[in-house]
Each structure stands twice: as C-alpha cells, then as structure tokens.
Amino acid sequence: METTTIDIQALKKELVLDLIQIGALKFGRFTLKSGIVSPFYVDLRIIGPKMLRQFSVLLYHVMTVKGLTNMEKRVICGVPYSALTFSSCMSMTYDLPMVICRKERKQYGTGNMVEGIYTKNETNCILIEDVITSGASIVETAEKLENEGLLVTDALVFLTREQLPLTNGMHILKKGEKVYNVHPCLTMTEVTQVLLDEGKMSQEQREDILQFIGTNTFSETKTTAVPQKKKELTFTERAELTNNEFSKKLFKLMEEKQTNLCVAADITSKDDLLKLADETGPEICMLKTHIDTLDDQPDEQFTQQLKELAKKHNFLIFEDRKLADIGQVVKQQYARGPFKIAQWSDLCNSHLVSGGSATVKALKESLKEENITEPRGLLLIAQMSTEGATTGESTKQEALKVALENPDFVSGFICQSKLRDDLDQFLYCTPGVRLDVKGDSLGQQYNSPEYVVCEKKCDVIIVGRGIYHDKERQNAAKLYRKLGWEAYQKRIQQ
C-alpha cells in the first residue's frame, strides 16, 4: 500500500469522523487513571480491520516523512498491549520486521522479555503507540528493550492528547541522559478542528477542550503522570499579553501601587461619594460608582471633581451602569444623555441579554463618534454575587466569545471565579467581598479576599459596605487593600 497515492489530510478527516461514529472518541466528563477529569476520552481498542489498515497508512507515512524507513537493521515494536495490533498490521502491510516486548518476564518457556529476531547493540527499534498522554508507557517500554540490547531513539504514535510539549511537531521524552523522539500522526487540535469544520462541535466546546489541554500538561522530563502546575503570572507580565490600552493601564497601576482593591461607592450623596473617594483613594486601584442612584443630580462639575481625585490619588473610575438595552440605546446611555459616562469613566460594564457583540459594537462606535481617545474598557457580566442570579454557563460562554472577538475594548469580566485559566490577558473582577458577614436580607452573598483571589483566581476585589459602612473608612480600606494584595502575592508564589 503506497502512501504517496493517498490524500493524507483527507484520510485524517475520514478517520476522525469514523472515530466519533463508532464511539472510539467521546466527549463529556471522564475520570482518567491519574484522577484528572477530562472533557474527552479515547479508546482505540474497538476499531475494526478497515480502520486498523488506515491507521497503519498514517503511521507508515509519518515513519517515511521522518526518515525512519532509512534506518539500517530496524524493527518495530508495539507498546504493550493495546498497540500490538497497530504494529502487527504495519508489519504485515509494509513487510516490516517486528518484535514483541512483554510487560513482565515469564518464568516459563524461553523466559525472554523480548520475542523476535534482532542483533544486540545493533538493531534499531521503532516503538508504535496508539495514544500518548504523559509518555510514561513509551519510556518504560524503551527501557525494557534497551536492557535486552535494542537501540531505541524514536516512537510513532497515532494520536497525541497534546498534554506534552510539542517541538517541531514531535514530543521529546527524557529519562536521565536518554532522549526519545515521539512523532504523532494526529493531534487533538487537528481532531477538534475537523469536528468544528464539519459541524460536529461548537467553538465553545473546542475552546474548552483546548483549555483543558493547556492547563493539564506533563513535564517532558517526567515518566509518571504528574501534571505541571500553570505558572501564575504577575500583573506586569499580564500587561504584556494584551493590546487593550485600558487593561495595560490597570494591570500596571495595580502592580505599581500594590493594590487590587476597588471600592464600590454605592451611596446616594454626591458630597459623600467625593469624600469617600478622597478618603480611600490612596488605597485603591479603582472607584466603582452608580451615577444614576445619586439623589442630587450629578453635573459636569461633579464628574470633573471626581476625575481630579482620581488623578490626585492615582486610581481609575468604574461606572457600574450594567448596560443591557439594544445597541442604539446603549450608545446614548454610554456617551450622551444626562450622565455622559464615556466622558469621565475609564471603565463601564454590560449585560449580554441584548446580544453582547451588538452591544460592544455600539459602545465602540459611540467612542469614535464622540472623539474620545483616552483608554476605555468594558467588563462583561458573566457571573453575579446575588442568590438566584440567572447568569449560568451559557452567559459565561457568551461572555468569553464576545471578549475573544473584541479584545481591544473588552477588558475582562464581572465574575465569581476566573473563567478560563489560559486567558491571562483579561481582568477578572469580583463583587461581593466582605469579611464580617456572609450575606444580607436581599440575597447578596459575600466572600473573603483570600478566597476570591487565591481559590477563585480573580484579580480585583470589589468591596462596598465593608468599607463605606465602617466608621473608619480609610482604615477599613487599608485592611482590605492589605488582605487583597497579600492574597495576590500568595497566588503568584504558589
């Protein structure tokens, strides 16, 4: 069977779709041997003769492309036991000499660990594997073969879960001074792309799978399945990941000022709001306002005073407007009307109920129409801190989708936990932070700074009544600043 006459990409596509059809590739929630819960599961033991022959074509194609067919004195060996059918099919189809490696030496018969014909210290052995996760079984088999005098440097694998680093299209496994090159035929990135293109998978499903892969990796030097913990980046490092000017500004401000505290000024007096801003300004990275709840009508003089306090104490202004109407209306609410939010507020937020993409487009247009050039950002409301909130999984997924489509303007999310571990370019801002109580009579639920920052991996703690109801507001702000920043320091050092 000549691979040169076969469309390899078409064959890959056919195999992916067939794997789904027969149930060899499943999506859902599966607990692996390591204890990790995976969004997909692969079982190639159920494939039939036709697919086995097609697998052999792909494996031999990679073997040829990588120059392994040019090796002198070579044999192949399937990693016991699931890959033995692969190596047997390749051996018969392409006339390749084959050996069999046992998992353990038998105490009867020949007692050989390796069965087959080879010359010690001369014969090269190419390993064949079905699926690779950590690479432990490949290294273990290679060591057994080497102990019997075979030379092992390379392995072919049908599918990689991509939980090992890929270098020039291959995995590099190390054990001591030994190095093994693993050449995959197919990656989960390719698999999910085929399923997306064929309408068998949504973009959100694909992103969840790729996120899982990115956050559940294994060290290339390990031979046991020990997941690598993702390095927690500093705010300074995360500022380099984004082209969003507001996000850059806030990340850098938090690091320089050493505060991730936002005070929620949910009060009804202009004078009291300005007083609170002046009292707590030295301790905060942002001041959150509700301009439409003030009893005395705010005017341009008031917003100018607020901007001057922000400049004096080096904090940013966040208007908690929760825009939710159709595009044309939110344009007016944001840039015009009695409040002219875009003129003085660095950051605003929005629900997704009227269509997140349309809302973002309208807000960006309003900035352009009003000729506002200062950095402006938007937080999408993905999760809320009130009991019974209807912001469920679909809201979260829509928020992620809109944010990824508009990274220049969407700075992050209002949320109760970090939405995706691999999206460090976004800000995760959490209301409902308080130390002394767990909730109120209207359904608000509170969490501690350490829980929000360390456990839930959020960035900005938003504190309202815990500060503005305190008789010593400045001291309360100092305390929350200290606790929030200590939690951040603890997180990045873990």
Curated annotation (Swiss-Prot):
It holds the Pfam family OMPdecase. SMART domains: OMPdecase. PROSITE patterns: PUR_PYR_PR_TRANSFER. The active site is at K322. Gene3D superfamilies: 3.40.50.2020, Aldolase class I. It catalyses: orotidine 5'-phosphate + diphosphate = orotate + 5-phospho-alpha-D-ribose 1-diphosphate; orotidine 5'-phosphate + H(+) = UMP + CO2. GO terms for molecular function: orotate phosphoribosyltransferase activity; orotidine-5'-phosphate decarboxylase activity. UMP binds at D266, K288, T289, H290, D325, S385, Q444, Q445, Y446, G464, R465. GO terms for biological process: 'de novo' pyrimidine nucleobase biosynthetic process; 'de novo' UMP biosynthetic process; UMP biosynthetic process. Orotidine 5'-phosphate binds at K288, K322, D325, S385, Q444, Q445, Y446, G464, R465. Pathway: Pyrimidine metabolism; UMP biosynthesis via de novo pathway; UMP from orotate: step 1/2; Pyrimidine metabolism; UMP biosynthesis via de novo pathway; UMP from orotate: step 2/2. Its EC number is 2.4.2.10, 4.1.1.23. Keywords: Decarboxylase, Glycosyltransferase, Lyase, Multifunctional enzyme, Pyrimidine biosynthesis, Transferase. Bifunctional enzyme catalyzing the last two steps of de novo pyrimidine biosynthesis, orotate phosphoribosyltransferase (OPRT), which converts orotate to orotidine-5'-monophosphate (OMP), and orotidine-5'-monophosphate decarboxylase (ODC), the terminal enzymatic reaction that decarboxylates OMP to uridine monophosphate (UMP). HAMAP family: PyrE. In the N-terminal section; belongs to the purine/pyrimidine phosphoribosyltransferase family. In the C-terminal section; belongs to the OMP decarboxylase family. This is Uridine 5'-monophosphate synthase. It comes from Naegleria gruberi (Amoeba).
